[in-house]
Regions:
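Short, surface-exposed loop/turn segments at beta-strand-coil junctions that are enriched for proline
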Residues: 64-69
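An acidic-aromatic substrate-binding cleft motif
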Residues: 90-126
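Catalytic domains of carbohydrate-active enzymes, especially glycoside hydrolases
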Residues: 107, 126-159, 313-320, 383-389
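An active-site-proximal structural segment forming one wall of the substrate-binding cleft
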Residues: 130, 137-140, 187-203, 220-246, ...
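Aromatic-lined carbohydrate-binding/catalytic grooves of carbohydrate-active enzymes
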Residues: 144-187
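Substrate-binding cleft of secreted/luminal carbohydrate-active enzymes
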Residues: 149, 245, 324-331, 348-433
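Aromatic-lined carbohydrate-recognition surfaces of secreted/lumenal glycan-active proteins
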Residues: 205-226, 246-252, 271, 277-307, ...
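Active-site cleft segment of glycoside hydrolase catalytic domains centered on the general acid/base Glu
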Residues: 217-289, 329-337, 366-374, 400-411
Length: 434
């Protein structure tokens, strides 16, 4: 379900049922989707798919939530003539005047911050986290309904597009027991990816798997090949987890989609490159898990520069999750104007626009510190078009006072408590609205 969890009744719900034929011959599948109950009156979709051996297909429908307020479940039923398979997902729809539910539904979770400068106040703490500490942190996120976990990256490699990195000589260090490359990050946890997923399974949460880092802003053919190999390994190792929700491409991009190239020809080439990357990566991931969405985070600057490319890109990118609306350059359009432009192009493409809310501010030395809760609440109320709001990030910015380890400064606890108070007030407002 896109988006999952709690949503407003002002959006459309994207429902996808993915099927992979693991048999040796062509197979016919009867596929049905139901709302709440498995009966004819609750049927959303009923179709037949013929899928060749080792191939995949997906059933996809979008339905408005206007009259669906309340807690519901969506049932997928698949029959191959011999066996019947069922999957059920729950959804909560709240009454609202706007698309946003005005709360943070999840957060980035960097296993080690990519920048020692930015992560100055927590990298030494996060390094000490064991697998059990990661499980504890996932429970803390669940406590404040941040039920979507975006793993920032599964390899650490500090390089930018234009570096001479290749698939074969890639020097990055893995956060998990990868068989692709020997390098390992020097952290206490043995397999934090498994710890995060297994705990998220128990809590009914969703994990967006960060396929990266090859090199920042790099969507070249070399980067594409690396991403395919890593995505395949991640799916083979962790795809059995119920919480494995999506593939997230870690590389990020500027809002202009041209990598800030001043030369018109180079700018055009970068735009062609990013579209080709996601076209190929989407096709590759669909063969593994056809229902899984793919997400990219872009910044909100220079959005008008990319408007000639977004329609084509969004054919292959399910979720666009931009950041930086609160710090737009003076020469750019406003954050609200950028959000409205992106919402329009996503609506036209039947793609999803989520919000990567920045829960941090920069110190003079460029280290990050928790943003005051009042500023976060301001953003939650200002940008009301986003169907789902995630934040950057949980570790080092929020800290549950009941956790056995503190990652970062003491004021991270204040932000956790402040957000918890806001959440209680929001729930009360929603209850009285009913």
């Amino acid at each position: 379900l896109i988006p999952p969890g709690k949503i407003s009744n002002k959006i459309n719900l994207d429902i996808r049922g993915g099927i992979v034929n693991r048999g040796n011959s062509l197979q016919t599948y009867q596929v049905s989707l139901f709302w709440d109950k498995e009966k004819k009156s609750a049927l959303l979709c009923d179709t037949t798919l013929k899928i060749s051996s080792s191939k995949s297909d997906v059933v996809k429908i979008m339905i408005p939530m206007k009259d669906k307020v309340g807690k519901h479940k969506v049932i997928l039923k698949v029959s191959d003539g011999k066996r019947v398979y069922r999957k059920t997902k729950e959804i909560e729809v709240i009454q609202s005047d706007i698309r946003s539910i005005q709360q943070i539904s999840g957060a980035w979770t960097g296993i080690y911050h990519w920048s020692e400068e930015e992560g100055k106040h927590w990298n030494q703490d996060i390094k000490k986290m064991t697998d059990n500490h990661w499980r504890e942190m996932i429970r803390s996120m669940h406590k404040i309904e941040m039920d979507m976990v975006v793993i920032q990256e599964v390899f650490r490699h500090q390089a930018y597009i234009g570096s001479s990195t290749t698939v074969e000589d890639y020097p990055g260090k893995a956060f998990y027991p990868s068989k692709l490359y020997p390098g390992r990050m020097d952290i206490a946890a043995e397999d934090p990816i498994e710890a995060i997923l297994s705990e998220a399974d128990k809590q009914g949460m969703q994990v967006l798997m960060g396929v990266g880092m090859f090199a920042w802003f790099d969507f070249t053919p070399e980067s594409l090949e690396w991403h395919k190999r890593v995505a395949k390994e991640l799916w083979d190792m962790y795809g059995h987890h119920e919480s494995f929700y999506a593939f997230y491409v870690s590389e990020e991009s500027g809002g202009g989609l041209n990598n800030w190239e001043p030369d018109p020809q180079r700018s055009k080439e970068r735009k062609v490159e990013i579209v080709h990357f996601f076209k190929e990566f989407k096709e590759f991931c669909s063969a593994l898990a056809p229902e899984k969405p793919i997400m990219l985070a872009t910044n909100s600057f220079d959005v008008p520069v990319g408007m000639d490319t977004y329609p084509e890109l969004l054919k292959y990118l399910d979720i666009l999750c931009p950041f930086g609306f609160a710090r737009m350059p003076a020469t750019d359009i406003s954050g609200k104007e950028a959000a409205d432009l992106l919402q329009k192009v996503c609506d036209e493409a039947n793609a999803h626009l989520w919000f990567d809310l920045e829960a941090f501010l920069f110190n003079p030395d460029n280290s990050l510190y928790p943003r005051p809760i009042e500023q976060i609440i301001h953003d939650l109320n200002l940008f009301d078009n986003f169907e789902k709001i995630l934040c950057y990030q949980f570790p080092g910015v929020f800290n549950d006072p009941e956790m056995s380890i503190r990652v970062g400064e003491a004021r991270t606890i204040n932000l956790f408590n402040g957000y918890m108070r806001y959440l209680k007030e929001l729930k009360y407002r929603n209850k009285t609205r009913k």
